[in-house]
Amino acid sequence: EGSVETNIVDLGNILPGHQISDTYIAVKTVVAELIKLNILPIILGGGQDITYAQYLAYETLEQKVDLVVVDSHFDMDEDITETIETNSIAYLNKIFLHEPNYLFNFSNIGYQTYFVNQDSLRVMEKLFFDAVRLGEISGSVHLAEPIIRNANMLSFDISSIRGSDAMANGNAGPNGFYGEEACQICRYAGYNDKLTSIGFYEFNPAYDQNGQTAMLMAQMVWCFIDGFYNRKNDVPLFHKADYVTYKTSLTEEAHELVFIKSKKTDR
């Protein structure tokens, strides 16, 4: 139980379509309609390729997207299909190459170096995308908050959590986030005034033991909802008096950087 009165509705399950594309279109349509109604959808289960359908909802809304993915891998394998269909290890290519392009920025949180090839890292650097290695953030999960703060949508792969805490995944491994770190990431996502959808993917109950992963996912959702109901509403910027502006010049460039800090939250 939380300290606030919540308004939550279980809309049931989206059944798999005859083709994968049918499932994508169903998810895309539902997510887009809910966002139009100012309702934040929480997607549970399914492969992480559903992230692509979640992203397509913003195309329907003609809205630029800042996408954050919590994952131990970069799911950028070559996708040879020219249709809407993809899979859980190639969906990012589908998003990056999608036309028209509504992707404003992409960030990965928690990648593990031995799962990522150097070509993928070079692609991230070339596109000016953010990628934070697990070793950089483990034990200092608060470093994820500035990245999550700008996200419009978030995709959380359960395999990014260590197998001892979340074994209900075909790709579960010995390393990853601790359960409490995953919950903190979800709380940060809930705090984000800009976030309008979130998905938790790759949960497979066939691999679960004593419902432990299901319990952890429930706690992650609880933390997200708790964060949502504690939003400070300091985005977008309404009154200049509510913010402190810092300006700095770059010595080698003729550009000025402007930082804006909320007096309400110190963010």
Residue ranges of model-derived segments:
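Conserved alpha-helical scaffold segments that buttress catalytic/binding sites
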Residues: 1-200, 204-267
